[in-house]
Design a protein with these regions (language model features):
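Small-polar (Ser/Thr/Gly)-enriched, low-hydrophobicity segments
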Residues: 4-129, 144, 173
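Amphipathic alpha-helical assembly segments
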Residues: 85-213
Length: 213
């Protein structure tokens, strides 16, 4: 008979249970349905989104393998950072301004450094108050480069965006609430592995790249 915590049992039949041999990854293309949310993403074919924490420094292949893999793309911005449904920070390439220099005008390409995706900063300069400040990236060290090397003097928090969307290439765009200007945040990265059998399931929709991946 069942109780308040467990279901009923049959005392005359006791099984031996079953063991799980393998968990296979299905990378085949599936039909997609719209969720009505501009920040939801899906992957057609091979590949994974890369997620982790804010402080993970990608300076080697081992560090790259330290990121978590997932194919679930329910994204949103929390406290300035792009996160998945469990609060893990999504990695990619943020927009930089002219070369590696910071400024309020985005360049035509993102940084080459794989970093946590975050919103541009909000300018406090009287001549450009509210503008999105695209923090530069030092290609040699990967460190942030702020205007005048003094972020506290020229920026205050993250820019406020609305109408945020992600296109088929992973490009994240929105509209600056303060100025009405378009803002390109950056691009979501996709990771791939040579050997799917080397991908290890951890929990829920998450995987890690093992040594054989």
């Amino acid at each position: 008979a069942g109780t308040t915590t467990v279901g009923g049992t049959n005392p005359q039949q006791i099984g031996y249970g079953v063991g799980v041999g393998t968990i296979d990854l299905d990378m085949s293309s599936q039909s997609l349905d719209s969720t009505g949310r501009g920040m939801d993403c899906a992957i057609q074919g091979d590949g994974f989104f890369l997620v982790g924490d804010k402080t993970h420094d990608i300076d080697s292949m081992d560090a790259l393998k330290g990121l978590t893999l997932t194919r679930v793309g329910n994204f949103e911005f929390r406290d300035g950072y792009l996160t998945d449904g469990q609060g893990n920070v999504v990695y990619g390439f943020i927009t930089r301004s002219n070369g590696d220099d910071p400024g309020t005008t985005p360049g035509d390409k993102p940084s080459t450094d794989l970093v946590p995706i975050r919103l541009p900063m909000k300018s406090t300069d009287p001549n450009s108050k509210g503008d999105a400040v695209y923090v530069g990236v030092d290609d040699q060290t990967g460190a942030n480069v702020y205007p005048d090397n003094d972020p506290a003097a020229t920026v205050d928090g993250f820019v406020d965006l609305e109408n945020i969307s992600i296109d088929k290439n992973g490009k994240i765009t929105g509209t600056n609430k303060d100025t009405g200007d378009p803002v390109v945040v950056g691009y979501i990265a996709l990771g791939s592995v040579e050997n799917l059998n080397g991908v290890l399931h951890t929990e829920g929709p998450y995987y890690t790249a093992g040594n054989a991946a």
